[in-house]
C-alpha cells in the first residue's frame, strides 16, 4: 500500500486504486471488435457485454435482435434465400464457434477465447438477471410439450421471472392459422425477451418474416437451447466448448442428423477462408 512521505502534500498523493469504483467490463465498444470473417460480420463480445445490451434494451422498451454465427450458419447463409434479412436486422451478431475464434486469431484480429458467446455461455447469468428484475421471458420452439416443460423447470428455479413456452411445431407460413395464433400468443404475453428455437434456418426466417408483428422485445434465435433446459437433450460440458470440441460430443449424440453439418459443410468454407488469409497477409505487408 502507498505510504505518504512525512510532510508530503496530501493533495499530490496518488489515489488509492481500491477506492475507485470498479466496473466488471467496459460499457463502450471498440471499432475493431466488429470484424468480418468468411464474408460476414460478427461482433467480438464477452457474455457480460451481451447481457448489458439485453438489460439496456429491456429498460428502454427497445426491440433488438441478437443473432449468432457459427460454421453451420456461414454455410447456410448464401444457400438460403431470405436468411440474410435476419442478420441485416440484427444489432449484435455473436460468435458461436471456438474454431472461428482460432481462425480470427490466425487472421490477426482482436479475438480471445472469451469472445465465444452463445446462450449456453451466459444462461445462468441471464436467468439470475431475469429473476432479479422480474422480466417476462417467452420461448417459441421445440417439439410439443418441450417448451412448456422447460418453462416449468426454469420457473421453479427463477420464480421472480415470468416464463412461458410455446411449441415450435406449427405452420410458420405467413398468414397461416398456426402462425397467426402463435403471433397472437406472443403479443398477448408481452415478453421482454423472446427466444426462438426452431433450428437454422427456420428460426431466422421466421423472425425476419414476422418482425413487424412481434412486440418490442429482445429477440434471439437459440436453436435447441431449451431442449437442454427441459432435460430432453444433454448439453456438452462447457470445457469442451472452450476447447472447440463440443461438436464431437454432439456428433456422437446424434450422428445421423449432424454428420453433414460437422463433417461435410465446413469443406465448403475453405475457399472463403483462403480469401481471408490472403487478405490478412496483404495487410501485414
Name what the model sees in each region.
Residues 2-117, 123:
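N-terminal nucleotide/polyanion-binding subdomain common to many enzyme families
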Residues 100-185, 189-190:
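Conserved beta-alpha
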Residues 37, 99-106, 235-236, 240-285:
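A transmembrane-helix-recognition feature enriched in membrane-embedded lipid enzymes
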Residues 70-73, 100, 198-203, 225-226:
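Short glycine-rich anion-binding loops that position phosphate/pyrophosphate groups of nucleotides
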Residues 63, 135, 214-217:
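A short helix->loop->beta-strand "cap" motif at the edges of active sites that frequently abuts
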Residues 186-200, 216:
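Proline-aspartate-enriched helix->loop->beta-strand connector
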Residues 167-174, 215-253:
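Short, flexible loop segments at boundaries between secondary-structure elements
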Residues 204-213:
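Short Gly/Thr/Asp-enriched flexible loops that form oxyanion-binding sites at enzyme active sites
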Amino acid at each position: 500500500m502507498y505510504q505518504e512521505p512525512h510532510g508530503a502534500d496530501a493533495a499530490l498523493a496518488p489515489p488509492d486504486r481500491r477506492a475507485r469504483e470498479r466496473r466488471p467490463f467496459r460499457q463502450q465498444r471498440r471499432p475493431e471488435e466488429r470484424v468480418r470473417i468468411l464474408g460476414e460480420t460478427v461482433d467480438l463480445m464477452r457474455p457480460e457485454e451481451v447481457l448489458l445490451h439485453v438489460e439496456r434494451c429491456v429498460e428502454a422498451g427497445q426491440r433488438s435482435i441478437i443473432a449468432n454465427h457459427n460454421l453451420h450458419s456461414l454455410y447456410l447463409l448464401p444457400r438460403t434465400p431470405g436468411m440474410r434479412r435476419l442478420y441485416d436486422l440484427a444489432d449484435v451478431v455473436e460468435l458461436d464457434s471456438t474454431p472461428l475464434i482460432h481462425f480470427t486469431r490466425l487472421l490477426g484480429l482482436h479475438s480471445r477465447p472469451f469472445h465465444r458467446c452463445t446462450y449456453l455461455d451466459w444462461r445462468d447469468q441471464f436467468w439470475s438477471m431475469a429473476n432479479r428484475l422480474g422480466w417476462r421471458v417467452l420461448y417459441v420452439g421445440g417439439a410439443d410439450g418441450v417448451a412448456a416443460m422447460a418453462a416449468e423447470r426454469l420457473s421453479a428455479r427463477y420464480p421472480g421471472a415470468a416464463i412461458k413456452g410455446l411449441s415450435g411445431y406449427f405452420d410458420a407460413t405467413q398468414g397461416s392459422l398456426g402462425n397467426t395464433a402463435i403471433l397472437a400468443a406472443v403479443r398477448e404475453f408481452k415478453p421482454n425477451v423472446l427466444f426462438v428455437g426452431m433450428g437454422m434456418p427456420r428460426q431466422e426466417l421466421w423472425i425476419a418474416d414476422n418482425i413487424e408483428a412481434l412486440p418490442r422485445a429482445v429477440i434471439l434465435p437459440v436453436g435447441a437451447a431449451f431442449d437442454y433446459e427441459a432435460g430432453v437433450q444433454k448439453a456438452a460440458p462447457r470445457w469442451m466448448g472452450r476447447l472447440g470440441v463440443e461438436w464431437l460430443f454432439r456428433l456422437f449424440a446424434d450422428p445421423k442428423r449432424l454428420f453433414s453439418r460437422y463433417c461435410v459443410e465446413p469443406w465448403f468454407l475453405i475457399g472463403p477462408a483462403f480469401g481471408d488469409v490472403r487478405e490478412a497477409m496483404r495487410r501485414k505487408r
